[in-house]
Amino acid sequence: MEGFDAVHSSPICQSFAAVTDWRGSRQDYPDLLTPTLALLNSYGLPWIVENVVEAARFGPLRADHVLCGTQFGRNVRRHRAFQTGNWDFFDLVEPCRCHRNRDLVPFGHKNERAFADAMGCTWMTNLEARQAIPPAYTHWLGTALAGHLNAQEVTA
Protein backbone atom coordinates (compact mmCIF):
# COMPACT_ATOMS: atom_id res chain seq x y z
CA MET A 1 0.00 0.00 0.00
CA GLU A 2 2.96 2.24 -0.56
CA GLY A 3 1.89 5.73 -1.56
CA PHE A 4 -1.49 5.56 0.16
CA ASP A 5 -2.42 7.41 3.35
CA ALA A 6 -5.63 5.48 4.10
CA VAL A 7 -7.86 2.72 2.73
CA HIS A 8 -11.63 2.32 2.29
CA SER A 9 -13.00 -1.10 1.42
CA SER A 10 -16.43 -2.55 0.69
CA PRO A 11 -16.09 -6.32 0.20
CA ILE A 12 -19.08 -8.10 -1.31
CA CYS A 13 -21.80 -8.66 1.28
CA GLN A 14 -23.78 -11.63 -0.07
CA SER A 15 -22.24 -14.11 2.39
CA PHE A 16 -23.78 -12.15 5.28
CA ALA A 17 -26.82 -10.37 3.78
CA ALA A 18 -30.20 -11.75 4.80
CA VAL A 19 -31.59 -10.82 1.38
CA THR A 20 -29.28 -13.41 -0.20
CA ASP A 21 -31.41 -16.18 1.31
CA TRP A 22 -34.37 -14.93 -0.71
CA ARG A 23 -32.51 -15.75 -3.92
CA GLY A 24 -30.45 -18.76 -2.93
CA SER A 25 -27.98 -19.45 -0.18
CA ARG A 26 -25.38 -17.34 1.57
CA GLN A 27 -23.05 -20.34 1.45
CA ASP A 28 -22.87 -19.88 -2.33
CA TYR A 29 -20.80 -16.71 -1.82
CA PRO A 30 -17.29 -16.40 -0.39
CA ASP A 31 -16.66 -14.51 2.85
CA LEU A 32 -14.29 -11.81 1.63
CA LEU A 33 -14.82 -9.64 4.70
CA THR A 34 -12.72 -11.75 7.09
CA PRO A 35 -9.56 -11.76 4.92
CA THR A 36 -10.13 -8.09 4.05
CA LEU A 37 -10.10 -7.14 7.74
CA ALA A 38 -6.90 -9.14 8.30
CA LEU A 39 -5.25 -7.50 5.29
CA LEU A 40 -6.29 -4.00 6.35
CA ASN A 41 -4.89 -4.58 9.84
CA SER A 42 -1.57 -5.70 8.37
CA TYR A 43 -1.05 -2.42 6.47
CA GLY A 44 -0.81 -0.19 9.53
CA LEU A 45 -2.72 2.58 7.72
CA PRO A 46 -5.99 4.13 8.88
CA TRP A 47 -8.87 2.28 7.22
CA ILE A 48 -12.64 2.04 6.92
CA VAL A 49 -14.56 -1.04 5.86
CA GLU A 50 -18.27 -1.13 4.96
CA ASN A 51 -20.72 -4.00 4.92
CA VAL A 52 -24.29 -4.98 5.74
CA VAL A 53 -25.40 -4.83 9.38
CA GLU A 54 -25.74 -8.63 9.40
CA ALA A 55 -21.95 -8.80 9.04
CA ALA A 56 -21.75 -7.14 12.45
CA ARG A 57 -24.49 -9.29 13.97
CA PHE A 58 -23.34 -12.65 12.65
CA GLY A 59 -19.88 -12.08 11.22
CA PRO A 60 -16.52 -10.51 11.97
CA LEU A 61 -17.42 -6.83 11.51
CA ARG A 62 -17.42 -4.48 14.50
CA ALA A 63 -20.08 -1.86 13.87
CA ASP A 64 -18.36 1.35 14.95
CA HIS A 65 -20.97 3.29 12.96
CA VAL A 66 -24.33 2.21 11.54
CA LEU A 67 -25.69 4.66 9.00
CA CYS A 68 -29.08 5.06 7.30
CA GLY A 69 -30.02 7.24 4.34
CA THR A 70 -32.52 9.19 6.44
CA GLN A 71 -29.65 10.48 8.59
CA PHE A 72 -28.42 12.38 5.55
CA GLY A 73 -31.73 13.74 4.32
CA ARG A 74 -32.28 10.87 1.88
CA ASN A 75 -35.65 9.15 1.54
CA VAL A 76 -33.88 5.79 1.61
CA ARG A 77 -33.84 2.95 4.13
CA ARG A 78 -30.31 1.64 3.59
CA HIS A 79 -28.55 0.57 6.80
CA ARG A 80 -24.85 -0.11 6.54
CA ALA A 81 -22.23 -0.87 9.20
CA PHE A 82 -18.73 0.62 9.14
CA GLN A 83 -15.66 -0.40 11.10
CA THR A 84 -12.60 1.82 11.43
CA GLY A 85 -9.06 0.65 12.10
CA ASN A 86 -5.89 2.42 13.21
CA TRP A 87 -7.94 5.55 13.94
CA ASP A 88 -11.28 6.35 15.49
CA PHE A 89 -13.67 9.23 15.79
CA PHE A 90 -16.93 10.10 17.40
CA ASP A 91 -19.25 12.41 15.57
CA LEU A 92 -22.99 12.61 15.90
CA VAL A 93 -25.36 12.43 12.97
CA GLU A 94 -29.10 12.78 12.98
CA PRO A 95 -30.86 9.69 14.33
CA CYS A 96 -32.23 7.20 11.83
CA ARG A 97 -35.80 8.15 10.96
CA CYS A 98 -36.69 5.47 8.45
CA HIS A 99 -40.28 4.33 8.10
CA ARG A 100 -41.13 0.90 6.76
CA ASN A 101 -43.89 1.99 4.39
CA ARG A 102 -42.63 5.43 3.41
CA ASP A 103 -38.93 5.18 2.62
CA LEU A 104 -37.58 3.56 -0.52
CA VAL A 105 -35.81 0.20 -0.33
CA PRO A 106 -33.50 -1.38 -2.93
CA PHE A 107 -35.36 -4.63 -3.48
CA GLY A 108 -38.91 -3.41 -4.01
CA HIS A 109 -38.48 -3.87 -7.78
CA LYS A 110 -41.10 -1.28 -8.61
CA ASN A 111 -39.29 1.88 -7.52
CA GLU A 112 -35.68 0.90 -8.20
CA ARG A 113 -34.97 3.95 -10.36
CA ALA A 114 -36.42 6.21 -7.68
CA PHE A 115 -34.29 4.37 -5.08
CA ALA A 116 -31.08 4.95 -7.03
CA ASP A 117 -31.93 8.62 -7.52
CA ALA A 118 -32.87 9.08 -3.85
CA MET A 119 -29.52 7.60 -2.80
CA GLY A 120 -27.80 10.23 -4.90
CA CYS A 121 -26.59 7.66 -7.44
CA THR A 122 -28.22 9.13 -10.53
CA TRP A 123 -25.52 7.76 -12.86
CA MET A 124 -26.06 4.13 -11.81
CA THR A 125 -28.37 1.58 -13.33
CA ASN A 126 -31.10 0.09 -11.16
CA LEU A 127 -29.10 -3.11 -10.71
CA GLU A 128 -25.90 -1.26 -9.77
CA ALA A 129 -27.77 0.78 -7.17
CA ARG A 130 -28.95 -2.39 -5.44
CA GLN A 131 -25.37 -3.04 -4.35
CA ALA A 132 -24.29 0.54 -3.72
CA ILE A 133 -24.19 2.73 -0.66
CA PRO A 134 -25.29 6.36 -0.72
CA PRO A 135 -22.29 8.60 -1.48
CA ALA A 136 -23.27 10.69 1.55
CA TYR A 137 -22.03 7.89 3.84
CA THR A 138 -18.59 7.81 2.26
CA HIS A 139 -18.44 11.60 2.17
CA TRP A 140 -19.21 11.82 5.91
CA LEU A 141 -16.65 9.15 6.83
CA GLY A 142 -14.08 10.45 4.34
CA THR A 143 -14.36 13.97 5.76
CA ALA A 144 -13.71 12.60 9.25
CA LEU A 145 -10.77 10.54 8.01
CA ALA A 146 -9.30 13.55 6.16
CA GLY A 147 -9.57 15.55 9.39
CA HIS A 148 -7.72 12.79 11.23
CA LEU A 149 -4.97 12.67 8.59
CA ASN A 150 -4.62 16.46 8.60
CA ALA A 151 -4.35 16.48 12.40
CA GLN A 152 -1.63 13.81 12.20
CA GLU A 153 0.29 15.96 9.71
CA VAL A 154 0.08 19.02 11.97
CA THR A 155 1.37 17.14 15.01
CA ALA A 156 4.20 15.45 13.06
List PLM regions with ranges.
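Class I S-adenosyl-L-methionine
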Residues: 1-7, 13-155
